[in-house]
């Protein structure tokens, strides 16, 4: 949008995403970099079975995604479920409900389109096309366009990272600031959430208390900036009619007032007499 000269959003908030996956590589990054593109296509892509909606589609199945998430921290998940069992015995309803709510969201996964998944692996985690300035995407006309974050100027940028994020490592999301070189420093903000993992910046107490208030304030600041920039234009427009009125009044005042000739007035007076 910015490269085409179109209007861009007031603000852009990027959270826990691998803008530059080379920084602080995690287990996810290492897997993507150490396996070939063909390996992913041959080992994690399957077709939807015939008795399910979308039968025959090639996908990265949700159950494999879930298994991968759990395998990253098996001890932590085992302890969480053990604590859940103890809380049930103690009758700690609040802790039990918090556990259920978290895992209801954590376990909710969807099959991912194969082409989308494989392209993401190659573009983001293997070839780093965005940071190398070599990423092309198709526009609505089917024509390739280069992605140029350096063309963004009027959109404020906020990035959010979790201190303990083991999926998108430290600095991977903040790298967006280095790419968006034309955004003024006053319109940039970075937040690192202390003690938060990847999911912590999106949900739960840390999201409610540490992340959401700042994101909300950042968006409101962008709206206020727009209103402030629009104010002079509004004032000049409202002043225009008043200027026209003043000009009209000036012309009226300058126009000579019609007066009767003294001779004609005297003649009329004589006739009346």
Language model features: what each stretch is:
Residues 225-273:
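Intrinsically disordered, polybasic Lys/Arg-rich low-complexity tracts
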Residues 152-153, 158-161, 165:
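Short beta-strand/loop motif that positions the catalytic acidic residue
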Residues 214-225:
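C-terminal alpha-helix
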Residues 124-149:
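Active-site nucleophile elbow and catalytic-triad environment of alpha/beta-hydrolase enzymes
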Residues 167, 190-210:
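Catalytic histidine-centered segment of alpha/beta-hydrolase-like enzymes
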Residues 5-7, 149-153, 180-185:
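Short, conserved loop/helix-junction motifs that constitute active-site signature segments
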Residues 2-115:
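Alpha/beta-hydrolase-fold enzymes
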Residues 166-175:
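Conserved alpha/beta-hydrolase "acid-adjacent" motif
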């Amino acid at each position: 949008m910015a490269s085409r000269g179109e209007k861009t959003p007031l603000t852009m908030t990027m959270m826990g995403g691998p803008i530059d996956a080379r920084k602080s590589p995690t287990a996810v990054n290492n897997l993507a970099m150490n396996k070939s593109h063909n390996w992913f296509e041959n080992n994690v892509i399957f077709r939807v079975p015939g008795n399910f909606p979308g039968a025959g589609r090639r996908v990265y199945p949700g159950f494999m995604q879930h298994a991968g998430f759990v395998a990253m921290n098996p001890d932590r998940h085992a302890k969480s479920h053990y604590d859940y069992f103890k809380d049930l015995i103690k009758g700690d309803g609040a802790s039990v409900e918090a556990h259920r709510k978290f895992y209801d969201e954590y376990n909710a996964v969807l099959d991912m389109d194969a082409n989308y998944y494989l392209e993401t692996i190659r573009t983001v985690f293997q070839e780093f096309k965005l940071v190398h300035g070599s990423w092309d995407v198709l526009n609505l006309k089917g024509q390739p366009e280069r992605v140029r974050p350096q063309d963004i100027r009027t959109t404020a940028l906020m990035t959010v990272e979790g201190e303990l994020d083991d999926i998108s490592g430290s600095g991977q999301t903040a790298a967006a600031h280095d790419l968006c070189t034309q955004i003024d420093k006053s319109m940039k903000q970075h937040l690192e959430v202390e003690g938060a993992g990847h999911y912590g910046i999106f949900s739960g107490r840390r999201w409610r208390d540490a992340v959401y208030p700042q994101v909300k304030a950042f968006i409101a600041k962008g709206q206020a900036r727009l209103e402030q920039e629009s104010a002079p234009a509004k004032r000049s427009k409202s002043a225009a009619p008043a200027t026209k009125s003043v000009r009209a009044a000036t012309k009226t005042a300058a126009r000579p007032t019609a007066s009767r000739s003294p001779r004609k007035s005297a003649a009329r007076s004589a006739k009346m007499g």
